[in-house]
């Protein structure tokens, strides 16, 4: 896009918001990513946007200035990692059910290791269903699988994540979201 419109200063600022709490997530972001063209990055405009973020959110918030490609990669890495975490937890839940293990105790013991984190662990999830749905994870997992294959990388891990999700969430409710309008409700 930047090549098509060289006189425009385009920046890419991926969002890291959840559908159910987008307003809260926006106000409480952990970092801002600013992607721009080339090296050095569009420094003047990136710096202006950085200053705007710091004025609004304070100096303690991390701001990473990078290329378009790296900014997009960061966004996909986040969503694909969280989708992987959901699929992993669903698979562990299936095992716990089979061996009659106490799922809640198992999860409590699991998260005492601080490296695990406390998000994307619920089985069933926040929507009362197994696996992941919504408008981001299914789309982003499929996009990364297809992109990897396009550039000659076999996407075994993400393909397995996708297969597990199709198994535990056979209704594929994300397909119902096409053309959906976003509201603040």
Feature locations, PLM:
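NAD(P)-dependent Rossmann-like dehydrogenase/reductase catalytic/cofactor-binding core
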Residues: 97-185
């Amino acid at each position: 896009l930047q090549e098509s419109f060289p006189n425009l200063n385009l920046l890419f600022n991926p969002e890291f918001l959840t559908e159910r709490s987008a307003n809260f997530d926006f106000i409480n972001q952990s970092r801002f990513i600013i992607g721009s063209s080339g090296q050095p990055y569009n420094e003047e405009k990136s710096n202006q946007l950085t200053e705007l973020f710091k004025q609004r959110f304070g100096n303690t918030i991390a701001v990473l200035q990078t290329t378009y490609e790296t900014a997009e990669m960061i966004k996909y890495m986040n969503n694909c990692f969280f989708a992987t975490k959901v699929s992993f937890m669903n698979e562990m839940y299936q095992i716990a059910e089979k061996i009659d293990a106490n799922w809640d105790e198992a999860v409590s013991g699991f998260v005492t290791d601080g490296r695990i984190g406390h998000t994307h662990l619920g089985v069933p999830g926040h929507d009362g269903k197994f696996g992941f749905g919504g408008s981001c994870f299914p789309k982003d997992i499929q996009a990364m699988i297809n992109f990897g294959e396009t550039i000659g990388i076999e996407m075994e891990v993400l393909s397995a994540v996708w297969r597990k999700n199709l198994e535990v969430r056979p209704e594929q409710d994300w397909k119902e979201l096409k053309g959906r309008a976003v509201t603040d409700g």
